[in-house]
């Protein structure tokens, strides 16, 4: 694909055909194509780049899969620190990537001026070209960065560098309609004589791309207005063919200024001498010759500029002399257009014009007169037919391509004619004649201006006549049977020599007509052959263009089909993934509801345990009171210590229960917050289809964490169930102790009744001792239960921490995903 090319339509800049070369960032970066040092260069992490170079010094000029170095990527991203680090490490500054672009070209392309300045200071070559033939200056022209262009030129950039289309930066700025860059390059003395492959000058390109501002700038630089391209067309012809009236007026005004300057150089004496001499020569001719001369002069003036001469030779082409202005009067009646004409192009134009006027005049009389004139012309000019055929054909093609500017050509013709006559005939006339003929010259100039305007209209009429001439080709085919019949008649006339004189005259007339018709048929056949060849060439060109267009259309259709298939596949895949995510979300919501219900059950169980503990404490306090009344001081102290420990244990259990309830409320709040975040993430998942894979990984991680949390929760439930069983056992033992206490109270009553029985008292004391031991055992069991409660608390704390860590990990994953997308 070409970088620079002219648009297919008039006035269209080259930007439409450039595509991705000048739009967006310089590179399409994919993470899979990069190494560590390249990733660090893209991010602008100079420290990481330095670490990579410290590990492996060979990574300094390492290339990725697209043949890009770290310097290319840093220049494209505009990371000045990385560029300075790599340049100071003496990397290859002029290394090229896959498109043969240097880091300097890439920096200018991405408009990273700081990076470009660093590279230029360290000796980067600004004249290297990429695969499209463009230098860094071409890219600076496209981006219209005068500061970058100035720095490139100050460091030795070639201002006349050519791309593949032979466009200099000035021509490329004109094609892209960059008026500021055109002014800048002209100030830097860019050449206005540069041409492209079709030999089109800067002015022609400015006209072709409809840039009147650039045209005015170039005209101020005194650019060559008469320069021609390969087809012989100048800037004014471009303006006429594209109907650009404003630009045409600008060029005409500039030409008139040039002509005025040339006229001012010629003296007034020379002008008067020329006018007098011209008038005397006209008066000296006979009347019939005078008429023919006026026709010839009117015909010669406009044909002079119909084909402007290329390059610096346009001044010679403007020196047109009147057909009979310098020749003697005797040569005029023959109306040979070759007399007095120096330029071969002008000679052909005059000859063509005279032949056309003769044909136009001969078309008026009757058919018999036409036959006579054809007969005379065939007798006089048969040897000249073969020579004039090729010139007439080329002249017809040239006249169909170009329309002359009659006003400027007439003025230039008059001026050159006056110069020639003024030099050959210096002041040889008296003063009276000068005054008389000055008036005549003014009248003649006015008449010539009107004639020039009429000639422009006549040229159009001539083109219409040529269309009629091409129609005569069909008539030529129709004349072939008549020619054959005439030949048969001539043969019969030859075979019958004994006929009378009238038949002999008829045969002579038929022979003459036959010769004339043969000559006309030969001319028409040659014209038909040329037309056929031209048509065949055009058809071949059109067929090639059609094949190319068909191939491009087929390739585009295939590409579009592939894109559609890829889009449908990706859409179907994304829909499946979204459906899977929805199912997972519903499943997670159900699991969360189950967890809520289980938490509510746990809270109810904890409340029931608290009520049971309160009842047990009350019963235990009653038993202690009874024991206080029974026991002595020593026994009372033991009972007090036991009650204190039990009360402290119970208070601890209450505190733990309250703490657990608070934790459950906090977990509910966190769960609700997580639920809201989950909803937000679900909404963001719909918007961000590209992050679905990473979200799936996160969801899988969360599922694993939830499963682990479920297992932890089930373990906690089992432990709670064990603790409840143990509490039930404790309650049963307390009831048993209460019963034993009641039995002991009864025995004490009996003892009080029976004070004499000391053995019973000792047994009771033993019973109290055993009950004290049992109380110690119960205290140990209660301590174990407290330890288990502490362990449960620790497991709950770990559960909450793991939840928090899971949320943090999800946030970190999202942060890394967003950072990757930004990169």
From Swiss-Prot:
Bias (Basic and acidic residues): 372-382
Pfam families in the cross-refs: Ank, Ank_2, CCDC144C
PROSITE patterns on file: ANK_REP_REGION, ANK_REPEAT
Protein name in UniProt: Ankyrin repeat domain-containing protein 20B
Residue segments, region Disordered: 302-343, 355-401
Keyword Transmembrane appears in the UniProt entry: no
Residue ranges of ANK repeats: 32-65, 66-95, 99-128, 132-161, 165-194, 198-227
Domain of life the protein comes from: Eukaryota
Coiled coil region boundaries: 431-480, 565-724, 776-805
Keyword tags: ANK repeat, Coiled coil, Repeat
């Amino acid at each position: 694909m070409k970088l620079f090319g002219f648009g297919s339509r008039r006035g269209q800049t080259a930007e439409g055909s450039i595509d991705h070369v000048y739009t967006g960032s310089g590179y399409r970066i994919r993470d899979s194509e990069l190494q560590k040092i390249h990733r660090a260069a893209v991010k602008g992490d100079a420290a990481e780049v330095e670490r990579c170079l410290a590990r492996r010094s060979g990574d300094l000029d390492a290339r990725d899969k697209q043949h890009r170095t770290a310097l290319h990527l840093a220049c494209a991203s505009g990371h000045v620190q990385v560029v300075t680090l790599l340049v100071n490490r003496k990397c290859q500054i002029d290394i090229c990537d896959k498109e043969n672009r240097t880091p300097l070209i890439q920096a200018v392309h991405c408009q990273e001026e700081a990076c470009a300045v660093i590279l230029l200071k360290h000796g980067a070559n600004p004249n290297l070209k990429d695969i499209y033939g463009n230098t860094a200056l071409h890219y600076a022209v496209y981006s219209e960065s005068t500061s970058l262009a100035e720095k490139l030129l100050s460091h030795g950039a070639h201002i006349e560098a050519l791309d593949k289309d032979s466009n200099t930066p000035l021509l490329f700025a004109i094609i892209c309609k960059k008026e500021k860059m055109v002014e800048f390059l002209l100030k830097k003395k860019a050449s206005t004589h540069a041409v492209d492959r079709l030999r089109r000058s800067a002015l022609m390109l400015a006209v072709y791309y409809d840039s009147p501002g650039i045209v005015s700038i170039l005209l101020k630089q005194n650019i060559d207005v008469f320069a021609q391209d390969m087809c012989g067309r100048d800037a004014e012809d471009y303006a006429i063919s594209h109907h650009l009236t404003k630009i045409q007026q600008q060029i005409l005004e500039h030409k008139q200024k040039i002509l005025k300057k040339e006229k001012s150089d010629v003296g007034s004496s020379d002008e008067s001498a020329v006018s007098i001499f011209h008038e005397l020569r006209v008066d000296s001719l006979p009347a019939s010759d005078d008429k023919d001369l006026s026709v010839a002069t009117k015909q010669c003036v406009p044909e002079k500029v119909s084909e402007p001469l290329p390059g610096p030779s346009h001044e010679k082409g403007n020196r047109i002399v009147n057909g009979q202005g310098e020749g003697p009067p005797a040569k005029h009646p023959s109306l040979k257009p070759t007399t007095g004409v120096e330029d071969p192009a002008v000679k052909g134009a005059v000859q063509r014009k005279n032949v056309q006027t003769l044909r136009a005049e001969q078309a008026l009389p009757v058919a018999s007169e036409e036959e006579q004139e054809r007969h005379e012309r065939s007798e006089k000019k048969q040897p000249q037919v073969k020579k004039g055929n090729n010139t007439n054909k080329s002249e017809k093609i040239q006249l169909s391509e170009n329309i002359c500017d009659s006003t400027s050509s007439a003025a230039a013709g008059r001026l050159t004619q006056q110069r020639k006559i003024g030099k050959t005939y210096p002041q040889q006339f008296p003063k009276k004649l000068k005054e008389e003929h000055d008036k005549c010259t003014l009248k003649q100039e006015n008449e010539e201006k009107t004639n020039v305007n009429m000639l422009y209209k006549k040229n159009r009429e001539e083109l219409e006549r040529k269309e009629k001439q091409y129609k005569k080709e069909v008539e030529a085919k129709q004349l072939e049977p008549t020619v054959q019949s005439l030949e048969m008649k001539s043969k019969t006339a030859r075979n019958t020599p004994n006929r009378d004189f009238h038949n002999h005259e008829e045969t002579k007339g038929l022979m003459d007509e036959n010769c004339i018709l043969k000559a006309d048929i030969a001319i028409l056949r040659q014209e038909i052959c040329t037309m056929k060849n031209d048509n065949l060439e055009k058809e071949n060109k059109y067929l090639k263009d059609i094949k190319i267009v068909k191939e491009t259309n087929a390739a585009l259709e295939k590409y579009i089909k592939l894109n559609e298939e890829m889009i449908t596949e990706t859409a179907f895949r994304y829909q499946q993934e979204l459906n899977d995510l929805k199912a997972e979300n519903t499943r997670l919501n159900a699991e969360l509801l189950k967890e809520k219900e289980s938490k509510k059950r746990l809270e109810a169980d904890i409340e029931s345990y608290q009520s049971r503990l309160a009842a047990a404490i009350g019963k235990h306090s009653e038993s202690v009171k009874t024991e206080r009344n029974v026991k002595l001081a020593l026994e009372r102290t033991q009972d007090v210590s036991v009650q204190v420990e039990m009360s402290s244990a119970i208070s601890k259990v209450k505190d733990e229960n309250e703490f657990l309830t608070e934790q459950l409320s906090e977990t509910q709040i966190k769960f609700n917050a997580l639920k809201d975040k989950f909803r937000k993430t679900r909404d963001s998942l719909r918007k961000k289809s590209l992050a679905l894979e990473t979200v799936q990984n996160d969801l899988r991680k969360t599922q694993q964490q939830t499963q682990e949390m479920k297992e932890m929760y089930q373990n906690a439930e089992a432990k709670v169930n064990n603790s409840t069983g143990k509490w039930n056992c404790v309650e049963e033992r307390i009831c048993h102790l209460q019963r034993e206490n009641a039995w002991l109270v009864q025995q004490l009553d009996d003892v009080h009744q029976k004070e004499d029985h000391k053995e019973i008292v000792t047994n009771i004391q033993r019973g109290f001792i055993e009950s004290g031991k049992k109380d110690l055992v119960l205290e140990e069991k209660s301590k174990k239960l407290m330890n288990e409660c502490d362990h449960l608390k620790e497991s709950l704390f770990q559960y909450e921490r793991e939840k928090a860590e899971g949320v943090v990990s999800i946030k970190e994953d999202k942060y890394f995903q967003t950072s990757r997308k930004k990169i």
